[in-house]
Amino acid sequence: NNFGGILQAYALCHILSNIIPQNEVYILTQKEKTFKGRLKKFLDYNSPAQKFIRQYIPINTLSGFTLNEIMKKNITCIVVGSDQVWNTKYYNPLYFLNFLEDNHTIKKISYAASLGSDLWYYSQQQTDEISNLLNKFNAISVRESSAINLLQDNLKIKATQVLDPTLLLQANHYNKFISDDNKRYCYAYLLDYTKKLNM
């Protein structure tokens, strides 16, 4: 239910579909493996965020992120991003496409990937693993200028700064999502939680 991440996924899919209309573009997700994960998904089914995803974002669910699964889907390119996919707090080798192993036929691209920090918090072991994986990418772009420096200083990898995908669409593109509901409500968009705001 990360509204920012959902809008980024929507915008990136929309842009890619316009650029390569002859190809299918969809979000890869993995089936929930734990009962707790499946229960949460079931309880969230009717949330506004999940309804939006079902209506506007093409999803393709994999039973597992393995090279065999990817090859079965005839996928030719995988794009990672945007949002804080490379934030140390959420470190997951999946976001560096480790499951593609040494496959050279599938293009690997990052679009507006974010580290979510101006400092490098990865351990040496993680840094070595990330360096190995990112060196297999065909193109790397990041959201913040600080990420360019972090990748260069810590991995000797060059990256390009690009716009967040939500900003690639005109503002009026989002008008269709705006509700005509006039009910009063309180809305808060919090990037970093604090004890005071999270009460």
Kindly label every feature range from the protein language model.
Residues 102, 151-154, 199:
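Short loop/helix-cap segments at secondary-structure boundaries that form the rim of catalytic
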Residues 56-58, 141, 156, 198:
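Glycine-centered secondary-structure boundary/capping sites
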Residues 193-199:
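A conserved mid-protein helix/loop that constitutes part of the nucleotide-sugar donor-binding site
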Residues 34, 61-64, 152, 170, ...:
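Helix N-terminus capping/helix-initiation residues
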Residues 1-3, 7-132:
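Aromatic- and Gly/Pro-rich donor/ligand-binding loops
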Residues 68-75, 86, 92, 112-191:
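A nucleotide-sugar donor-handling region in carbohydrate enzymes
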